[in-house]
Amino acid sequence: MFAASLCRTCHQISGEGGIAGPDLTQLGNRFSTKDMLEAIISPSKTISDQYGSTVFFLKSGGSVLGRLIRQDNLKYYISQNPFDTQTIKAILKKDVVRTRVSDVSPMLPGMINGLNPDELKDLIAFLKSGGNPAHPAYASSK
């Protein structure tokens, strides 16, 4: 379910998966099932500074949204696509009038909407267990 619901595209568990979002290997040790479900259902409720996006307001009147990867004296380098973190866009600092941290998570809401109750239980068991199939969380997901 972790791969089928696209979680793996952005998140790692036990060293496998994407890097656009936080590593979820220890999630079950830090958060309750309720907290996990809230974070999945409403990802913008709490956004880690590490993984949030920035809005760059341009002199032209437009704006650009992306995760700030790095910057130098002349440019901001941002990733705009959480499914393709290797594609980086450069924005000239001289073209930016201001920036602000976005209050919208790059994680899309409703990622679990297509799961049936058993699939959702399996996903939560996987998250609670850190991907360990022998973890007791699987017994309670049945």
Q: What residue ranges belong to the model's regions?
A:
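Extended surface/linker regions that mediate inter-domain or inter-protein docking
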Residues: 1, 52, 63-64, 69, ...
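Positions in alpha-helical segments
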Residues: 22, 105, 109-110
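Long, low-complexity intrinsically disordered regions
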Residues: 108-142
